Amino acid sequence: MADFEDRVSDEEKVRIAAKFITHAPPGEFNEVFNDVRLLLNNDNLLREGAAHAFAQYNMDQFTPVKIEGYDDQVLITEHGDLGNSRFLDPRNQISFKFDHLRKEASDPQPEDVDGGLKSWRESCDSALRAYVKDHYSNGFCTVYAKTIDGQQTIIACIESHQFQPKNFWNGRWRSEWKFTITPPSAQVVGVLKIQVHYYEDGNVQLVSHKDVQDSVTVSNEVQTTKEFIKIIESAENEYQTAISENYQTMSDTTFKALRRQLPVTRTKIDWNKILSYKIGKEMQNA
């Protein structure tokens, strides 16, 4: 083991550690980080070499964070990344510093966030908040307004999670939606992602995503926003229904085909009895 460690460079160790961290299941970053920390056995190397992995994980997962003094949580995403560990909160028109290890926000500062698209962003943000409140028991959203390649663009991000470590499962829903403000119509592009990890007496992960394309009539802010939210609601309902139906189908067919529900004898095995028989026999022979 020591010989192997000597032959692996620090750069390679960090690369492997970063890979583990970026693939940590939702809600299990700390557990994976602590395991990697023990394996690497070099805190300075881990913090300095894998810092990009911490940031990438939080942005990929749409990690929500509460900023002291403000009511609503904001999502950590690539769209709000200002560099130097600072992120944008468009709703409150501030930027803040984010600690990717502690998952804490600090140093809020005023920030110009809308790029001349304030009414569009606020209209979409208000409607999306209402939608998320209706459809997600623990959901958060952040809406950005940006000019990308000369086109005025609205980007809407949604995150919802349930972390149940005592019941051995964690899960997260993420969706991202974009459209450009280009009358008379614009293409809507969305990506929906579900990731669930179940680890009681086993290790099963569901990782699924779906790409969506649609179009929206671009008129005024209010009417366009209504159409935009309808597209989101329809696509997300359809995706959730499809996932549920596929799960049921897999339970009824695929999983049953993988193993017998009963052994060839057609009777269930009482492992506790077998264990007690074995122990009793060994005691008799002693």
From Swiss-Prot:
Q: Which InterPro entries match?
A: CapZ_alpha (IPR002189), CapZ_alpha/beta (IPR037282), CapZ_alpha/beta_2 (IPR042276), CapZ_alpha_1 (IPR042489), F-actin_cap_asu_CS (IPR017865)
In this UniProt entry, the residues modified to Phosphoserine are S9
Question: Organism, per UniProt?
Answer: Mus musculus (Mouse)
Query: Which GO molecular-function terms appear in the entry?
Result: actin binding
Protein's UniProt keywords contain Transmembrane helix = no
Any Gene Ontology CC annotation: WASH complex
- Family membership noted in the UniProt record: Belongs to the F-actin-capping protein alpha subunit family.
- GO biological process entries: barbed-end actin filament capping; cell junction assembly
SUPFAM superfamilies reported for this sequence = Subunits of heterodimeric actin filament capping protein Capz (SSF90096)
Q: Which Pfam families match?
A: F-actin_cap_A (PF01267)
Task: Provide the function of this protein.
Answer: F-actin-capping proteins bind in a Ca(2+)-independent manner to the fast growing ends of actin filaments (barbed end) thereby blocking the exchange of subunits at these ends. Unlike other capping proteins (such as gelsolin and severin), these proteins do not sever actin filaments. May play a role in the formation of epithelial cell junctions. Forms, with CAPZB, the barbed end of the fast growing ends of actin filaments in the dynactin complex and stabilizes dynactin structure.
Q: Which gene encodes it?
A: Capza1
Keywords associated with the record = Acetylation, Actin capping, Actin-binding, Cytoplasm, Cytoskeleton, Phosphoprotein
Give the protein name, as stated in the record: F-actin-capping protein subunit alpha-1
Taxonomically, which superkingdom?
Eukaryota
Q: What is its main location?
A: cytoplasm
Q: Which residues carry this modification: N-acetylalanine?
A: A2
Q: Where in the cell is it found?
A: Cytoplasm, Cytoskeleton
- N6-acetyllysine modification sites? K19, K97
Task: Cite the record's note on assembly.
Answer: Component of the F-actin capping complex, composed of a heterodimer of an alpha and a beta subunit. Subunit of dynactin, a multiprotein complex part of a tripartite complex with dynein and a adapter, such as BICDL1, BICD2 or HOOK3. The dynactin complex is built around ACTR1A/ACTB filament and consists of an actin-related filament composed of a shoulder domain, a pointed end and a barbed end. Its length is defined by its flexible shoulder domain. The soulder is composed of 2 DCTN1 subunits, 4 DCTN2 and 2 DCTN3.
